[in-house]
From Swiss-Prot:
Record GO cellular component, one term: peroxisomal matrix
Motif (Microbody targeting signal) on chain: 648-650
Name of the protein in its database record: Peroxisomal biogenesis factor 8
Gene transcribed to yield this protein: PEX8
Gene Ontology terms: biological process: peroxisome organization
UniProt keyword annotations, A-Z: Peroxisome, Peroxisome biogenesis
Compartments where found: Peroxisome matrix
Signal sequence, start to end: none
Primary site of residence: other
InterPro entries found in the cross-reference section: PEX8-like (IPR055334)
Length: 650
């Protein structure tokens, strides 16, 4: 008893005794800020917003000093009607921010774990609260965004400190939380859901797909067999994603939630495709999915010259699409069913290639070097069509070429990209398509491009098509609707005109290296022992004389921007002639060596030395492949060139 107790009157002593029996002697218990927060979470005022609640959580969680408060705060939050209600009427945008909020909380707590509540005890208490909620099947769906947010923090924790105190116990909680996330996602997706909650679950699943094993994903796939279509709808059609292409024309600076997770979503799509147990259903779903993606790809063509922001979004979308396509092609290769591949795969490949056709202006900007997934998808689709369905390939050529606005190619990135993709595809199949398509449709268009194209890449692609067309007669072609003899005659009739035009384009449009490839390629298909030579024995002489006459009339005018020999037009054309000397028949070989030497002697200094070295290399190359002809060339060299005391490579 206090010393002053006896000095009090009767009423004073009664009050003192009453205070002593209270839980808090000599004071009145007042609510703490945390008590107010608990009340605010479970019964928010009209002025309370979801953002305000999340800011409270982000502030208070890392500062909590005992497990009981961690558990209590978690349980109160999961009863907050602004995010969770019994009717499961949620806002996708608001509830998605729960994921980001808890990732931030876990990151922050991990970094300030001491000296208050250690991270393991904090984490375990939070998990304990989630486990209590999961026990009620009607409330299990509420746990998903919290669990996913915590799991997203795992990688950043490892980057910060891979072996913190109690790291093995922390890893145990991680594993239990992964199982909980998989289990709650499976239960949450089973049955009818509001669109927002379904979207939330799909994004949440994509965020943790790298931590789930195939068996867990397969269980989710079984309760939600339409999840691949949901993923596609969410990505390409919903306002949370690309919104049917409208996102690209919006001025909103905030990147939509789904677009931020496109990489994860495409990985999830690939994983689910690879383990889908019902092949027929999968094939039907993929057909519809590719329809949606192709339709979206057509919407981007309305942007002829994208801004930097649009380019950035388009790159992300391209990578995501290619990843999905790679998963589709890999799945059918995994099945390895010839009947299925021959009936289903060509249709899928047609839609994939058309999407790539529409997106080629993006590929043209970033390039495909090192882009192995793109190269795999393109090569796989091409192989499928050439193996199973050439008519579809022909249809694609007609549709694509007809859709190109040729007059806009020079001023529109999209039209230029379409034309370049079309030409690349034509180059790959020109030896397989029907003669009618080839001679009546393809070749006239390509010849016109070679003569009139202003864009350098288009010009070079057109030349590549023509070279492939010419070399296609070098071997017998078994394709249907292809008359081999007719092809040989067409090549013979067009070759000299094409070579003349190519030589005219040097050096303004084509480099010496490019013209050299053209000259050497055409020479190989016209000289003796070729199908073209059998059809027209004199054609090789026309080609040879055409190149030789260019050497005769070429001036010593220096080529622009050339640092190494040959630096003159005469030297350049002479080097072209030297490239095809090994192909000349034996009985004409020495006479052409003499003509070439005469041309070389018309040059001086380094240019002459370069041409003589090149001529000697040509003779040595001839000797390796045609020893009899090479022996004649070597003898001639020592008798004529060495006697003139010219520098030569010996």
């Amino acid at each position: 008893m206090q010393p002053w107790y006896h000095k009090l009157g009767r009423q004073g002593r009664q009050l003192a005794e009453q205070w002593q029996t209270d839980a808090e002697p000599w004071g009145v218990a007042t609510p703490t800020p945390l008590d107010y927060l608990f009340d605010e979470l479970t019964a928010p005022k009209p002025s309370t917003t979801p953002d305000k609640v999340l800011s409270y959580l982000a502030y208070y969680y890392p500062k909590l000093k005992n497990e009981n408060n961690v558990e209590l705060l978690t349980l109160c939050f999961l009863r907050c009607p602004l995010f969770f209600n019994d009717a499961q009427l949620v806002s996708f945008s608001d509830n998605y921010r729960v994921i980001e909020c808890f990732k931030y909380i876990m990151d922050k707590k991990f970094q300030i774990s001491q000296p208050t509540l250690p991270f393991y005890r904090f984490y375990n208490a939070l998990f304990g609260a989630l486990a209590k909620v999961v026990a009620d099947s009607a409330c299990a769906w509420k746990v998903v965004p919290v669990a996913v947010g915590c799991l997203l923090s795992v990688d950043s924790r490892n980057d910060y400190d891979r072996y913190p105190e109690h790291f093995q116990l922390i890893a145990t909680v991680d594993a239990k939380l992964v199982d909980m996330a998989a289990h709650t996602l499976e239960r949450s997706m089973d049955g009818p859901l509001s669109n927002d909650l379904l979207c939330l679950n799909v994004v949440a699943l994509s965020c943790v797909q790298d931590k789930l094993v195939d068996s867990q994903l397969l269980r989710i796939l079984r309760v939600r067999s339409d999840i691949l279509k949901i993923l596609t709808e969410l990505t390409f059609n919903s306002p949370y994603g690309l919104d049917n292409g409208r996102l690209l024309t919006k001025s909103n600076a905030n990147t939509p939630i789904v677009v931020r997770h496109l990489n994860r979503i495409s990985f999830l799509f690939t994983k689910l495709t690879s383990i889908h147990p019902k092949i027929v259903l999968l094939a039907d779903d993929l057909d519809l999915i590719l329809n949606r993606i192709q339709t979206f790809s057509e919407s981007v063509l309305s942007i002829p010259n994208p801004s930097e922001t649009q380019w950035s979004t388009l790159r992300v979308v391209l990578f995501a699409q290619v990843m999905m396509f790679e998963g589709i092609m890999a799945r059918f290769f995994q099945i390895n069913n010839h009947s299925l591949n021959s009936t289903v795969l060509p249709t899928l490949c047609r839609k994939i290639l058309t999407t790539l056709f529409n997106f080629n202006f993006v590929v043209d900007r970033i390039g495909t070097g090192g882009f192995e997934s793109y190269n795999f998808v393109y090569a796989s689709c091409l192989s499928t069509l050439t193996s199973y369905d050439i008519p579809t390939a022909e249809t694609l050529i007609k549709c694509w070429t007809s859709s190109v606005a040729f007059k806009k190619v020079d001023n529109s990135a999209t039209e230029r990209g379409k034309l370049l993709f079309d030409l690349q595809f034509i180059e790959n199949v020109v030896n397989l398509v029907s003669d009618s398509l080839k001679f009546e449709f393809i070749i006239p268009i390509v010849q016109d491009l070679i003569g009139n194209a202003q864009d350098q890449a288009v010009l070079e692609s057109a030349h590549s098509v023509m070279l492939k067309y010419f070399t296609s007669v070098d071997t017998y072609n078994e394709a249907q609707l292809v008359d081999y003899t007719n092809n040989v005659k067409h090549v013979g009739a067009q070759l000299i005109d094409y070579l003349t035009l190519s030589l005219d384009q040097f050096p303004a449009r084509l480099s010496l290296s490019q013209v050299g490839i053209i000259v050497e390629t055409l020479a190989k298909i016209t000289f003796p022992d070729t199908a073209v030579h059998e059809c027209d024995p004199e054609l090789y002489r026309e080609l040879l004389l055409l190149v030789y006459n260019r050497c005769l009339v070429a001036t010593s005018e220096e080529l622009p921007n050339v640092q190494a020999p040959p630096k003159t037009r005469h030297g350049a054309f002479t080097s072209l002639l030297i490239r095809i000397l090994p192909l000349i028949p034996f009985d004409e070989y020495q006479s052409w060596l003499e003509r070439t030497l005469s041309l070389a002697f018309r040059t001086v200094g380094d240019e002459r030395t370069y041409l003589l070295d090149l001529l000697w290399d040509s003779i040595l190359g001839t000797n390796r492949h045609y020893p009899q002809k090479g022996y004649v060339g070597i003898q001639w060299w020592y008798e004529h060139v060495n006697e003139s005391q010219e520098k030569a490579k010996l």
